């Protein structure tokens, strides 16, 4: 499968199944496009047939010199022979093996607090309550959750635990106690816990910062961008904005972590479709690690992104990519999560095919110990998998998630970005279509654009080296 596109003056050709990316001149771009119109997948041998050259000369001869067309065809043949162009699908045959693979639990999202001190207007957790009641996780439930993770992690040594909410700092003592318990259990069971925390920063102080820097491998700091944008969507319950309180704390924390192992994480809505300005605002505040996610909501929500917003969003990603290139050239570069693509390595085959591991390798735990496939399914009875006392009592839910992959979704099968997004978010699929075996179309369009921008940036920055 070939995907071709032009962006910021670059002609880019992606070979989906080999993962190869080529930056080519106009004639090579057009030659590849023409031979790719064949009803059958081109091979090195078929490209050498005389009629291929003849058709190219007929089609492109009025645009390019004959010698240039011949050279471009020769390059295409060489790339095809080298397994970098027109590579056949070698992944679909692995699906059954991936579906049958034995999985272990590697990560837990601990809902340490089903309560929050903000009232964000787009919050899927309903101010932290998750379709239920306000509650704080007890130390006893948290211990059982860590014990469950150790017991169900098999031979895997490195385990991940994210303290989530609501707002985790509203239950700070239990967070500290559970980290201490985890460190004790590491020695007993030859495990290593990688703790992370997601916070709105309202309760952040020097004592918490010191502990976080000592014990947390990563910190997610919630902020939506410019003051007027953040305060519109992330107010306190009395309507007052949160920006002025939290930004200085976040700046201090980021500096104390040497601008590493954290993310400023925002959400953009219909209210700020010019979200590239929010990313640049983060950069101007001194942050180096950032992400801004599209809100996901019902179309009836006034802030929800709709299909008619997509052209503007595409423009913003292009604009952001160009601004990031300029900042990098000026020595003021920063990382944007959605443009971070590893073209040399990347995730294993199972991850490329089936995604984040929700429901199988990654689970969410409520304050009272119930287990769900991920934080976005919490509170939905159909996805209650078990609890920390009894373990998984509905393995059929895990089986359903395990069977979900880019080949089980019709919309993914012929998508060039399928190995970069691994089929997208299953919670979004369920919320929009009532099944995890579908995709959220607006999210797909944005993902494809982000992949294109990320690869273009690599080409542009390679030119500077």
Protein language model features and the residues they cover:
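Short Fe-S-cluster ligation motifs
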Residues: 146-164, 400-401, 439-465
């Amino acid at each position: 499968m070939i995907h071709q596109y032009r962006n910021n003056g670059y002609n880019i050709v992606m070979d989906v199944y080999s993962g190869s990316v080529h930056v080519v001149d106009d004639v090579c771009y057009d030659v590849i496009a023409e031979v790719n119109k064949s009803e059958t997948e081109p091979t090195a041998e078929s490209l050498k047939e005389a009629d291929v050259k003849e058709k190219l000369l007929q089609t492109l001869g009025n645009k390019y010199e004959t010698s240039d067309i011949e050279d471009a065809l020769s390059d295409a043949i060489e790339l095809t022979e080298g397994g970098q162009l027109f590579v056949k699908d070698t992944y679909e045959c692995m699906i059954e093996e991936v579906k049958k693979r034995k999985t272990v639990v590697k990560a837990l999202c601990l809902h340490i607090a089903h309560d929050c001190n903000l009232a964000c207007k787009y919050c899927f957790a309903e101010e932290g309550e998750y379709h239920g009641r306000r509650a704080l996780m007890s130390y006893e439930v948290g211990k059982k959750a860590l014990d469950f993770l150790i017991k169900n992690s098999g031979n895997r040594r490195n385990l991940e635990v994210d303290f989530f909410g609501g707002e985790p700092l509203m239950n700070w003592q239990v967070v500290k106690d559970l980290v201490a318990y985890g460190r004790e259990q590491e020695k007993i069971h030859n495990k290593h816990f990688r703790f992370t925390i997601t916070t709105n920063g309202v309760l952040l102080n020097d004592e918490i910062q010191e502990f976080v820097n000592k014990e947390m491998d990563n910190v997610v700091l919630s902020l939506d961008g410019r003051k007027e944008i953040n305060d519109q969507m992330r107010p306190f319950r009395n309507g007052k904005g949160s920006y002025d309180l939290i930004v200085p704390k976040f700046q201090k924390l980021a500096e104390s972590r040497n601008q590493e192992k954290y993310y400023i994480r925002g959400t953009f809505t219909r209210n700020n479709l010019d979200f590239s300005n929010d990313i640049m605002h983060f950069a101007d505040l001194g942050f180096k690690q950032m992400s801004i996610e599209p809100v996901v909501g019902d179309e009836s929500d006034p802030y929800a992104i709709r299909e008619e917003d997509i052209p503007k969003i595409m423009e913003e990603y292009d604009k952001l990519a160009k601004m990031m290139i300029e900042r990098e050239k000026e020595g003021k570069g920063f990382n944007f999560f959605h443009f971070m693509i590893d073209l040399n390595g990347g995730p294993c085959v199972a991850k490329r095919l089936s995604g984040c591991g929700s429901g199988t390798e990654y689970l969410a735990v409520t304050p009272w110990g119930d287990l769900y496939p991920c934080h976005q399914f919490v509170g939905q009875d159909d996805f209650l998998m078990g609890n920390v006392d009894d373990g998984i009592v509905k393995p059929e839910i895990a089986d359903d998630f395990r069977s979900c992959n880019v080949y089980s979704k019709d919309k993914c099968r012929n998508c060039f970005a399928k190995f970069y997004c691994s089929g997208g978010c299953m919670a979004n699929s369920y919320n929009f279509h009532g099944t995890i075996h579908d995709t959220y179309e607006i999210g797909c369009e944005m993902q494809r654009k982000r992949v294109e921008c990320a690869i273009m940036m690599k080409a542009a920055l390679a030119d500077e080296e």
